[in-house]
Amino acid sequence: ATPLQNALVAAAVANGGKVMRPTLVDCVRSSDLSVISQTKPRVMSRAFSSDTAGKLTQMMEAVVTKENQNLAIDGVRVAAKTGTAQIGDGNTSIDGWVIGFAPADDPKIAVAVVVHNVDLYGSFAAGPIMKAMMQEALAE
């Protein structure tokens, strides 16, 4: 799966099971910065029930609170899932993955990060990048 596909997975959990159509442009502005057009969120499909999304959110929060405290952000409930994938070319390097969203109780951002060809697990290779992205997005 691509990073975009995995970001859509994280976003689907955050959105109660709804898979949203990804967009690249939030809005188009004129030279005076007034909004000319605004992208509207669109649901592509429902992947699973909101009940299942709630259970997945609890499990993903536990990944942060119990297993990977380095992904935690003070004052923010973070939901994440780390992953490590072998590259398969005969060497010992791996891809380190993490997907997640925050705040878990009122999601504003969903993220997927992959760091290719590293010697670290997902929480250590990709985790700090996800955390920094979330902190920056939530600070705005």
Task: Set out the residue ranges of the language-model regions.
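Active-site beta-strand/loop architecture of penicillin-binding DD-peptidases
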Residues: 1-43, 60-140
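Helix N-cap and loop-to-helix transition residues
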Residues: 2, 49-50
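A structural-propensity feature for long, helix-poor, extended segments
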Residues: 42-44, 50-51
